[in-house]
Amino acid sequence: DMEITDETVIYESKILDSHPLKYYIIHKPSGYVCANKDPHDPCLITLLPDDNLHYVGRLDRDTTGLVILTNDLKLRKRLTLPEFHIPRTYAFTCLNPLKDITSFKEGITIDGDVKCLPAIVEMTSEYEGVITLEEGRYHEIKKMFLSLNNKITSLHRIMYGDISLGDLE
């Protein structure tokens, strides 16, 4: 008689395999990449004691902030798939004053024909603000700003769902 759970495999009342679920929240510094191997840049995963982990939402090399790593593939799927509507929140600085935030609410078209899901932007100054979105396409925020003839100069993820950086530095 065999029993298999997310954490263990039990056969004839003996534990054959045990994989405790692990969760890490890390404050990604600039210059690191969210990859397991990279020939040019240091990988964020090398800062952790366990390399059998998966990224929950990658960040670009120059983007800083909250990254989650786990071996819990069910959680990873739930946090990353768009149908679960998990918000990601970023603080940003842009090159030019951002005057048109209504375009974000309507969904901005990037790469010529890809319409992004609506995003919420709150400005804290002419050049700085916070953006919240529910998907994580490749360079999505940077491309949204480029489509408005602007450029992101600093991007920092502060929340992923209900998880925040807190006091992590």
PLM features per residue range, with description:
Residues 1-169:
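Basic, flexible Lys/Arg- and Gly-enriched helix-loop patches that mediate nucleic-acid binding at interfaces
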